[in-house]
């Protein structure tokens, strides 16, 4: 009985985590990037700069095969992550890549060691995203 209950609990917990991931994917792209940069949603002095950098990163993501084939851009806080990507499996990686690239463009670290660490991480994320996009393309061709 306890095993069944534990099994059900894990299943319930899994469903809850899927629900929570879906909720996060419905967050505003601009707002979530700003939060991860340490800016409040209300503080809009740098919104134009951040939006410009976000759109640059969307161009890079499109070029490596992630997101809509015809590109994507934002103009305000209205677009949410699911407007760009529906695959919850790579959502966190896309979001991490976005934030790190925007941070490097908007507010690069003063320390050369930290800067190099960020660049290395960006390169790894980019490689992983490109590889995942290529694998998905191959899988779609085989279907």
Residue locations for each model-derived region?
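Targeting/processing segments of secretory and organellar proteins
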Residues: 1-2
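Short loop/turn elements at secondary-structure junctions
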Residues: 5, 10, 15-16, 21, ...
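N-terminal, Lys/Arg- and Ser/Thr-rich interaction peptides
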Residues: 20-40
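Residue-level detector of well-ordered alpha-helical segments, enriched
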Residues: 29, 49, 53, 93-94, ...
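Structural recognition of short helix-loop-helix hairpins that underlie histone-fold modules
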Residues: 33-45, 62-69
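Amphipathic alpha-helical segments that form the core helices of the histone-fold
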Residues: 44-64, 77-87
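An N-terminal amphipathic alpha-helical segment
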Residues: 67-77
């Amino acid at each position: 009985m306890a095993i069944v209950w534990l099994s059900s609990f894990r299943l319930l917990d899994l469903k809850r985590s899927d629900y929570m991931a879906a909720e996060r994917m419905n967050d505003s792209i601009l707002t979530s990037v700003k939060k991860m940069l340490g800016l409040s949603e209300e503080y809009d002095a740098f919104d134009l700069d951040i939006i410009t950098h976000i759109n640059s990163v969307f161009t890079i993501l499109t070029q490596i095969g992630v997101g809509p084939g015809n590109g994507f851009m934002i103009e305000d806080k209205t677009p949410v992550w699911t407007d760009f990507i529906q695959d919850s499996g790579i959502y966190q990686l896309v979001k991490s890549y976005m934030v790190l690239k925007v941070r490097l463009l908007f507010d690069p670290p003063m320390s050369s060691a930290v800067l190099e660490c960020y660049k290395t991480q960006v390169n790894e994320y980019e490689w992983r995203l490109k590889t995942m996009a290529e694998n998905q393309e191959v899988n779609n061709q085989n279907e």
